[in-house]
Amino acid sequence: MAQILPIRFQEHLQLQNLGINPANIGFSTLTMESDKFICIREKVGEQAQVVIIDMNDPSNPIRRPISADSAIMNPASKVIALKAGKTLQIFNIEMKSKMKAHTMTDDVTFWKWISLNTVALVTDNAVYHWSMEGESQPVKMFDRHSSLAGCQIINYRTDAKQKWLLLTGISAQQNRVVGAMQLYSVDRKVSQPIEGHAASFAQFKMEGNAEESTLFCFAVRGQAGGKLHIIEVGTPPTGNQPFPKKAVDVFFPPEAQNDFPVAMQISEKHDVVFLITKYGYIHLYDLETGTCIYMNRISGETIFVTAPHEATAGIIGVNRKGQVLSVCVEEENIIPYITNVLQNPDLALRMAVRNNLAGAEELFARKFNALFAQGNYSEAAKVAANAPKGILRTPDTIRRFQSVPAQPGQTSPLLQYFGILLDQGQLNKYESLELCRPVLQQGRKQLLEKWLKEDKLECSEELGDLVKSVDPTLALSVYLRANVPNKVIQCFAETGQVQKIVLYAKKVGYTPDWIFLLRNVMRISPDQGQQFAQMLVQDEEPLADITQIVDVFMEYNLIQQCTAFLLDALKNNRPSEGPLQTRLLEMNLMHAPQVADAILGNQMFTHYDRAHIAQLCEKAGLLQRALEHFTDLYDIKRAVVHTHLLNPEWLVNYFGSLSVEDSLECLRAMLSANIRQNLQIWVQVASKYHEQLSTQSLIELFESFKSFEGLFYFLGSIVNFSQDPDVHFKYIQAACKTGQIKEVERICRESNCYDPERVKNFLKEAKLTDQLPLIIVCDRFDFVHDLVLYLYRNSLQKYIEIYVQKVNPSRLPVVIGGLLDVDCSEDVIKNLILVVRGQFSTDELVAEVEKRNRLKLLLPWLEARIHEGCEEPATHNALAKIYIDSNNNPERFLRENPYYDSRVVGKYCEKRDPHLACVAYERGQCDLELINVCNENSLFKSLSRYLVRRKDPELWGSVLLESNPYRRPLIDQVVQTALSETQDPEEVSVTVKAFMTADLPNELIELLEKIVLDNSVFSEHRNLQNLLILTAIKADRTRVMEYINRLDNYDAPDIANIAISNELFEEAFAIFRKFDVNTSAVQVLIEHIGNLDRAYEFAERCNEPAVWSQLAKAQLQKGMVKEAIDSYIKADDPSSYMEVVQAANTSGNWEELVKYLQMARKKARESYVETELIFALAKTNRLAELEEFINGPNNAHIQQVGDRCYDEKMYDAAKLLYNNVSNFGRLASTLVHLGEYQAAVDGARKANSTRTWKEVCFACVDGKEFRLAQMCGLHIVVHADELEELINYYQDRGYFEELITMLEAALGLERAHMGMFTELAILYSKFKPQKMREHLELFWSRVNIPKVLRAAEQAHLWAELVFLYDKYEEYDNAIITMMNHPTDAWKEGQFKDIITKVANVELYYKAIQFYLEFKPLLLNDLLMVLSPRLAHTRAVNYFSKVKQLPLVKPYLRSVQNHNNKSVNESLNNLFITEEDYQALRTSIDAYDNFDNISLAQRLEKHELIEFRRIAAYLFKGNNRWKQSVELCKKDSLYKDAMQYASESKDTELAEELLQWFLQEEKRECFGACLFTCYDLLRPDVVLETAWRHNIMDFAMPYFIQVMKEYLTKVDKLDASESLRKEEEQATETQPIVYGQPQLMLTAGPSVAVPPQAPFGYGYTAPPYGQPQPGFGYSM
């Protein structure tokens, strides 16, 4: 039996299977902060990636393109911390957002999450904690101790409260790995250096201590051996006993001399220390005692990272092969292991108690029994209470304590036991009962309540029953905790807490008999019963049938409570609740009509029987409700006429629910019944629904009853809103007939809907006493003329006066016109005008009179109004017209009168006198009218004076338009007359601007010359001089130079710039020269005229530095570098030194540049100037001056100049410069170009730069200095990034031997890396294939196998390719290669070893084909190896197809135990072919999975009898008995025939065989067959057959046996019958006892049958002479 293990070991996944490159599985690239995530940094092609593996979904790794030096996942969430250089960032992957970032001043060499929100950062000097919460920066915790200097930091740990911090590092010393730790106390701020390799903190609570102790565990492998230390850090908490220090040896096997601890985790659940070593060993130690529990090797590779495994309270880690492994305590096995294997029962007991582990039951029972036997009951009680899994907390233990009598004055052992259990936790069900029974008997109920509150008792139904007799409320609490629903609900009902019943029942999913409960509650309290009933139906699905609940209410005649219940229960108004709604309304209509009225009024229900309820409402006197429910018109008309019993407002609304026809019928019925009583309601209904009922129908209905009063009130209610003209007309008619004249006036005044003509004619015909309505209609609709005629002809002149005085005085002009038309006297008209003073339009009155040529009629009235001080324009207009027509000094009136309208009067004068029109228009500033009059009458002088005085730019713009045909004469008058007369500058300014705006430059010049040059008051005006020159620039450039020379008071710089912009460069030059602006003048010569010779002459004449500078700049731009430099020197201007240097560089004027830069250096000690001066000296080959300059004080960038000299191949100068700045790298490059190779190598050694080594190396290769090249190359190849370029350089030049020599020499370097081994292997494959195999066998683990694979394949090195595929675990490719190139690559042992590891099973069949073709004699060996994974059916089909089955017979025999049909049939065919009948019979008996019938049919025709015998055997096996027997008879196999007939159990077949024996005269066979088929043969048939054939002697033994059996049966039957009779007699005398259990007989009594001889196949043949079973009845 295998030994039990105390640990459970599990491999969770293989990182390489997830596509992780093995090279990236290491301490520097893989991190695991917890068992949730693994984070790996990879480089795929040129892209850096971070792979995050979620351990809950490892098959879907997350890949992110992130370039970082390190990445660590948060222990719990998808938050990642990234480090790139000194920059730290924290990202939330799910939110895709950056949480925090910080840049450190020092490099972070190690970092780790120490909690869910804190990262520890370790630099070379200190340790920091960085919280990801808020905006906090990293906080320094402590400085690193000197003992950790030079160590590789491998871990950082803290205790639970982060009060103790531990930094761990390792270093190589004296050929061993030494561990160094720094333990730091946050509170004391002190550090202690400790030698150790792995450590962890733990919280441990010792027995008897109140608080947990903080333990520090660390392991060390020193020169003397390994030790595990467990100590308590800090001062023990108050009241705690200090934890005793532990120091135990850590065993390391002899073969692991260099092994040391690398990781430690402590299981908080089991208090076990997990220690892992470098060589993959795991050690388990008990935390409390330090005892070693278990040690074994779990990994052949180093486990370099670990974390706690929360799911199992164990440890999880990753080794270098990429296996993710976990180890945890096997709870079922650890205690038995400690007990049986370690033989440490004390530790087993201690761990079992401490961690509640099973496996120590026997130890605890033994200890308990021993203490109990000694009378040490208190200790026994402790053992029983502390035993894990409650193994001793049994009723038997309680009975044992109960059996012990209590000592006087002492607590009984039972109570001691219960006391210990209560201190530790909760009692179980039996313990709770046994404790509470005596407590309740003593009346100490408060103890029970206390224990229940503290959850010390396990509640049960039995405990509740026990408590209920004392306190039902307390019992309720027990029942609730015990979850006994029926008892809980019973207690709720008994204690009156019915509101909790439903809630509790729903909560626990219990369904009691709700109706029974309701009856009980209703009997006790109807109010509580109502409340309970409402709770039953408050959900969507009622708990009980509402009808049954209502029946319960009605049983107790609780109408009010039932109503309240139903109102609440039926509030959702469901269709299915219709009968209940009817029942609710019915009971209230019969017993409380007011309640029913309120319910109906709230419109809560809609699904009750409306017809039935309507009848009940009418009987109850609720006519309104009855009408709401009536649907028949007869019923409605019967009720609706009683309007005095109905609410009028409701009745009006009710009509809205009736159809139009029904409404009209009801209205007719109301008027017919009592028109006086019902008229008001009728009118209200008609008013509200006139749109639906049609106003015309209602009007006709009123008129049919001759009710004009009703019609008036009805139409009065709608006329204000109606747009129907007929309604308004009918309303006017009704108002007239009812004498409502004021209403007629109002509607005539306010309505806009009636037909005015129709109403006017009606009012004329009506002959009303008051004509005001008619006046209003005529006034509103402009029938004034008709009105005047009607009133004048009917002698109603007083209404004319009333009209113009009171109704509408503004209509006076129309009335006057009408009166003039009827030849009314002038006196009457004048009097009427005087009566209506100022309340009408004078213009209209003048127009009416003027139309009739009676204007003079108004002269006295007009003069009187002016005399009164009237300022109305119309009055003055009329008077002006009269004065103009009468020629009564009109011009004076027009100039002096300020009140008339200039446009009106001017228009009146245009044809009569244009001059007067101009006067009128000018007075009113009527510009357009004035212009038109002047243009039409050629009054241009007047117009020009008016325009100048007007000073309106817009007006000027309108007359100066090119489209104006009168523009030229107007301009002539402006220049000659208007401007000459003016002295106002503003008038001149506006006029000039107008000409400018109109774009009339020539006219403007003419105008300005008149003003400026003709010695006017405006001659020296600066703006006008500027304008004159600018206009000339624009219009006539020939005059510009003249104006420049004649005028002096203009803005020279602005004018000059404008001249330049208009390409008048000479004029601009003249202006600048005239005003001595020389810099601008020379600029014009340079930039615009472009004549540098004139500029040079001008500069010599001026001799100003600024002018020389401008000239120099221009010369420089034109490429005249030498002249430019001379000009800059004359200007003494070094400001443009950069442009000068650039130009000199381009043109090569180095000598001149030296002069310029020497001048510039005197003016400014610029670094650029001195740098360029050095380069210029180098270019002019003044090396002595250069060396003197650079050795003296200077600010030049010598390195930069050296690089330029180097680039331009001035290597001598570059040598001086690089030497000066000690740039050995560039010096070495320079020396290479000078051919000084040895000196170049020395310089490269001083520079120690990869780039320099590479450059010198390449130069040495080109110079064939291979020894020096190799010296350089050895410094390059250790850098993996540079290796490829170096190899390509050698290869491109064909120096393969030298390259291989260099790489072979480099393999021994300390910094030799994978790329070197890989590239050397590739070179071997190309140039020295004979050395390839040896190299791979030595260094296969250090080469990049995929890369070498490609090289080996390209070089056709098939054996080496197979070797690499095998090492790279690409077994499929290895097999394919061996099969494709068997001559070079195939080796039998290697092939069979690899083929079993392939992933693609298809290769098995290709391998079989390969062996069949190349190695047929070894095929069976291969098949034996492949058989575990081979599909045998497919293999057999293949061999059958190629007809090679005999070749693989050994394979077929070896796999036949699988009972495969194809294998069986193939082997059987081989046996038949080989005529091996014995092997065939053995195969058939052992393996039955083949086509039996097909094989039998094939064999029955075989020429060998043994094979035909097997055919009969097969027919027998398939129940083809007759065919089998016939075949035996044919081949004279008599024994087989008798045996098969016997086995068939077929009587007919056996008798046929007997007959055949007799026919063939085989009497001996007949006798043998009688006994062989004894059970099948019928004695009568045998007797008859023997008698007929006279062979009674052969049959006699058979008959003797038959007689013997039958006599035995009869004797047994007789004995059985006698026994039965005796039992019957005994039964008759026995009294009937009802208490005895009754038997259920499954069948009646039957005749006993003696036992028969056994038959095969579970079937018993009936005895001869007994009835055979029929189809359900006995025959």
Curated annotation (Swiss-Prot):
Residues 480-523 are annotated as: Flexible linker. Residues 1213-1522 are annotated as: Involved in binding clathrin light chain. Residues 302-330 are annotated as: WD40-like repeat 7. The keyword Coiled coil does not apply. Its main location: membrane. CHCR repeats lie at residues 537-683, 686-828, 833-972, 979-1124, 1128-1269, 1274-1420, 1423-1566. Residues 196-257 are annotated as: WD40-like repeat 5. Belongs to the clathrin heavy chain family. This is Clathrin heavy chain 1. It comes from Rattus norvegicus (Rat). The lineage of its organism: Eukaryota, Metazoa, Chordata, Craniata, Vertebrata.
